[in-house]
């Protein structure tokens, strides 16, 4: 990952808060767009989607400022580590809490999502292995290689 010149400052905390807020807004607006479209409100859906794209770009600004965008290998490793934390810790902890509070259906959902996150981690690690094995050469499908004259 890149260098984070804000490490350990209030500004770093603010950047993470801004990134989280913009990321959450993007997802909410995407969900809202689906509801509006299903109800026949095409213009409202389009506005939600346009705003969601704006929020994505805002989030990217803060993510880049935090030094979190690396090269493909770094991004794959970062993604794999995040997925690992989700399936080994976060969702298991949440499932246990839900069970203790009597929300067994939700606990099962947490564990189901954890299983998917495990597959995500495995996929990212396999891709990382492939990228590292290729070195600095990007993958080009055979059809693209043949057309390079």
Regions found by a protein language model. Name each.
Residues 1-149:
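Non-heme di-metal
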């Amino acid at each position: 990952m890149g260098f984070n010149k804000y490490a350990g400052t209030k500004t770093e905390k603010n950047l993470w808060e801004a990134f989280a807020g913009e990321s959450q807004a993007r997802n909410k607006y995407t969900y809202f767009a689906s509801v509006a479209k299903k109800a026949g409100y095409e213009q409202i859906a389009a506005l939600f989607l346009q705003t969601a794209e704006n929020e994505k770009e805002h989030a990217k600004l803060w993510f880049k400022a935090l030094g979190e965008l690396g090269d493909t290998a770094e991004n794959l490793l970062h993604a794999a580590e995040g997925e690992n934390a989700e399936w080994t810790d976060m969702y298991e902890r949440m499932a246990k809490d839900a069970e203790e509070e009597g929300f067994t259906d939700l606990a099962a959902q947490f564990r189901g999502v954890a299983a998917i996150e495990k597959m995500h981690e495995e996929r990212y690690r396999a891709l990382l292995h492939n990228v590292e094995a290729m070195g600095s050469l990007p993958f080009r499908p055979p059809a693209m290689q043949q057309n390079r004259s």
